[in-house]
């Protein structure tokens, strides 16, 4: 079973962003091309994902489509949760068909997050860590630290990210999702 261990931090100014980019590369992280991502979040027909702390989304990265399920967060300091992501066929026709299938099954769209993501990768303490700089429409800039691990590696992965966040000089992490931040603290208001 795979678990995503994640920490997210807001970046208040452009100077913070430039300084962080420099620090990331000093750690030997390898930069990759920026990606445009569009995430459509779906509500389950008979389960309140806000109450169960689950996520189901359709993600578009360029022409590629992904369906992702994230289970409840199981850590009080990071966003550690089970994650299942399945790549689907590419293209807008497939995206429309996937959405049609989901809505036919009773799922309904509840919100969309659009971002430009610049990923960096590095190996640290035996973990492949992805550091991403996200420019989220309507929210601004954030940095995420993320790694995927199995159940036995969760504690070590968490400590790896804590140490990296301290060394990068990141402040207090933001545990709310981009969708929750965009919708406000109470998603039932919309």
Language-model segments: which ranges?
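A generic structural motif
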Residues: 11-13, 147-153
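Coil-to-beta-strand transition motifs
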Residues: 2, 126-128, 138-142
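C-terminal accessory/tail domains of diverse enzymes
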Residues: 49, 139, 151-153, 190
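N-terminal strand-loop-strand beta-hairpin
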Residues: 1-126, 162, 168-190
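Extended, acidic-biased charged interface segments
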Residues: 140-149, 160, 164
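Residues forming anionic-ligand binding surfaces in small-molecule and nucleic-acid pockets
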Residues: 70, 74, 136-144
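Glycine-rich, acidic/polar active-site loops that bind/position phosphate-bearing ligands
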Residues: 156
